[in-house]
Structures are given as structure tokens and as C-alpha cells.
């Protein structure tokens, strides 16, 4: 969350184009997650404990799962956030107008390292973590 305010300032001139470029949308979703985390007003661990208890009481509390994923995203706990979003996708693919899927894709966009330059006709290597979570998303969506 250290770069949040700098990112907002840098992002302001292109905010109108957010829906046109997926990478911008992904950055906006990250900043929204950071705003959510800041707005909780409690310590992150306290908020996680509260969300965990809500989820334990109702495994289908997708709002709590999504809030937990946003909190994890804000603290750059990418794999934990994607695992939580996958839990939503496996139970209800279209929950809240595909919000979990969109957030999941945003995390993939954010954590994917830049592709190295390769010779013409060659395919750049995939990041193993990103490739693994893309497969998991495909499995959840297509099942």
C-alpha cells in the first residue's frame, strides 16, 4: 500500500480510459482494494479474523470472501487472494456481475512479470505461478 497515493496521481490523466485497457482496469481494482483496506479502520489481522469467522459461519458468504480477497490484494498476498476468489468462482461463477472473476484476472495482470524480448517466431516463457493460476481459473470457469 506504500505506492497508493503516487499511483492515484499518476493514474488520474488516464482514468477515463480505464474500461478500454485491461491493465488500467487491473490497476484500478488494486487501488480500490487498497482503499477498502484503508477504510476498514482496524488492523489487518483483526479484519481477517472477523472475515474468517463470517466465512466459517457461512461458507457461501461471498461478500465476506470477496472482502477477504480485497484485503489480501491490498497487502500483496496474491496467491491467498486468488485462492479466496477461486472459492467464490467454484461456488457461483457469475456472483455479483462476475466481480470475483474480474478481480482474479486483475491479480493475474498485476503479478505477471513483463515478457522478455525474444527472437522473432519464438514464444516468451510464462511465469509458472501465473500459468498455474490461469489454469485454475479456466478449470473453475469451465467446470
Language-model regions: role of each:
Residues 8-12, 51-52, 84-85:
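Inward-facing hydrophobic residues that define packing positions of alpha-helical scaffold repeats
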Residues 1-2:
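Short, small-residue-biased leader/transition segments that mark boundaries at the very start
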Residues 17-58, 127:
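Alpha-helical adaptor scaffolds
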Residues 51, 65, 101-104, 133:
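TPR repeat positional signature
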Residues 28, 68, 103-104, 137:
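Structural register within alpha-helical repeat arrays
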Amino acid at each position: 500500500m506504500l505506492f497508493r497515493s503516487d499511483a492515484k496521481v499518476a493514474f488520474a490523466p488516464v482514468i477515463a480510459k480505464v474500461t478500454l485497457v485491461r491493465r488500467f482496469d487491473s490497476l484500478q481494482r488494486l487501488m480500490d482494494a487498497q482503499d477498502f483496506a484503508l477504510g476498514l479502520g482496524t488492523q489487518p489481522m483483526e479484519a481477517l479474523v472477523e472475515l474468517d469467522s463470517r466465512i466459517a459461519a457461512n461458507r457461501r458468504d461471498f461478500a465476506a470472501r470477496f472482502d477477504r480477497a480485497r484485503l489480501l490484494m491490498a497487502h500483496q498476498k496474491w496467491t491467498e487472494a486468488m485462492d479466496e476468489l477461486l472459492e467464490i468462482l467454484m461456488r457461483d461463477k457469475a456472483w455479483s456481475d462476475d466481480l470475483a472473476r474480474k478481480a482474479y484476472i486483475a491479480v493475474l495482470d498485476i503479478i505477471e512479470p513483463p515478457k522478455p524480448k525474444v527472437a522473432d517466431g519464438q514464444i516468451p516463457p510464462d511465469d509458472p505461478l501465473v500459468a498455474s493460476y490461469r489454469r485454475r481459473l479456466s478449470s473453475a470457469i469451465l467446470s
